[in-house]
């Protein structure tokens, strides 16, 4: 037996070195019939120590030692296991997996798992994964020992306390099974696999998809373009026509603001789309108009059924669902009414249908109050088509009957106050020749929005379009010329007059501290243009097109006169800069012969119009109610420089405060008292302002029911602060025509006065005035 064979068959873990030294090799001469096994027997008192050490060696995670079957059989034949070893093995088994004791020691369990993992033979090739024969030990006694360890391991795994080992074993068994089976099986595909690509759409689905996309993009700006695409979408059958009309109807009723646009679309489609034969023999042909009106009728008649279904949702858990459905039913009802009214304007709905709708909403019994939903719908209906009905003499007679019924509803106590005021608004609208007090919300084109912005901001026509597109007008609408400038260049936008950050160009009106435009005084001495020109401006070539320059700068470039620069006289010192001088290389400027400057007579600044003053007043008042700075508001009002307009300021302040609500009453009174104490406002300004507001109270109280009460509180507190005289109360009440509003103002004022001792003293000293006010209330 060679030395290499001795190293291979060594029972010591690691195969060489350690306990026994070279002695172990001499005691196991495989090939000899007998041998000495004294090292396995206990020697003296070293029995327990040796056993412990042997147990430790069995569980140490050292390198595995492989033995052939023949070697193990030879060992089985020549080795006789001593009783001490068997007893030690039995003690270890009882300690590790006793009959009654649970596995509590985690360390021992980990050691057992480690032992089992390293005790099993692992002959798998993990790289090539080729099946190899597994060597199995053939020792009978040892097989029982390993079986016990394996059973203990399986029972511990089943308890679920070491899932990580379970996962590792499962993974190992999975790899083993795959290695034994051979190649991996093919993937099983689903019968209907998921795919990014959509299935083939039918012609109807394709058309409806196209129509939905067109309706989602429909705006007044793109109306003509998208209308043509909708006509060419492929509406070739009656079923497609009905579904397209349903899509348009749903969009219209859920977007009431765009109902005029959808009504115009329906009118055009009715003219362009073909009609189809009836599906029933002898029936009428299917047209766009007939299908659309059927949808409107079904929605109108089915509203009551929808409300009855909503009323059945009475459970506490159905509260949110009930509210959502109520809102949806209300939106669809009002949208349907609005659409029918707009279709009447397009002559697609006959007037007899309109009268039928009105009679259904008002009810047949004149002494019975209609439902709140019907009252709101009829008010919306008359806001839309009232003017068209009044233009027809025959329909006007019916309108008189309808509006008499509405007038009765304004005094019906069974109706909510919101709806009573809504009916009163419709009556006022008719009495005002159908001219609304406020502009109606409707869809507008971008050009219309820009035009309104230019009018409100005082900009030149086309300024907003130039800012949006980043180019200025060149006359031909083409690209910018080499001499033109782009709006995207830094600092160019700031040169536009009236824009934020605008530069002060020659002759351009200045801006005050509050960003209001203030004309320059003509008596202000003008500086030398040569000194004012910076080197970059004097040497830089300028564009030849003077239209591209800001207002007021044309005179500086071309020498022409401008109304903004002066009264048409030449520039001081006779300096004239021509385009040829600016486009060529820089030359020394030679001034013209000096001429004595013309002394201009100081001219008074033009007086601002009432419209400008009103805009400024509303702006400063809104700013005050936002920041609540008295001194800032005082400065802004003084900068108006129009004491005659102060009563209007008082009226606008009261109007804005009462429109905002009760939280703005205290800031309003602080402002008026502050301006009165600072001698900015006089007593006559406050009195006149209150009279102006009281003359508007009859109309304002329709939208602001609490306005009379709050106005009475304002008057009472102004009287208490001695800013207002008690004599003005009678004149204020005379300006109010409605007796109900008049009584509300007087009662609120008296309540404030009586709650204060000084107010009681004022009332006691002006008994005659109070009696006169009381007579105004009793005379009605």
Curated annotation (Swiss-Prot):
The keyword Cytoplasm does not apply. InterPro entries: ARM-type_fold (IPR016024), Initiation_fac_eIF4g_MI (IPR003891), MIF4G-like_typ-3 (IPR003890). Residues 533-548 have a biased composition (Polar residues). One of its GO terms (molecular function) is translation initiation factor activity. GO terms for cellular component: eukaryotic translation initiation factor 4F complex. Keywords: Initiation factor, Protein biosynthesis, Translation regulation. Residues 457-482, 506-549 are annotated as: Disordered. Residues 208-432 form the MIF4G domain. Residues 612-734 form the MI domain. SMART domains: MA3, MIF4G. Belongs to the eukaryotic initiation factor 4G family. Plays a role in the accumulation of a sobemovirus (RYMV) during viral infection. This is Eukaryotic translation initiation factor isoform 4G-2. It comes from Oryza sativa subsp. japonica (Rice). The lineage of its organism: Eukaryota, Viridiplantae, Streptophyta, Embryophyta, Tracheophyta.
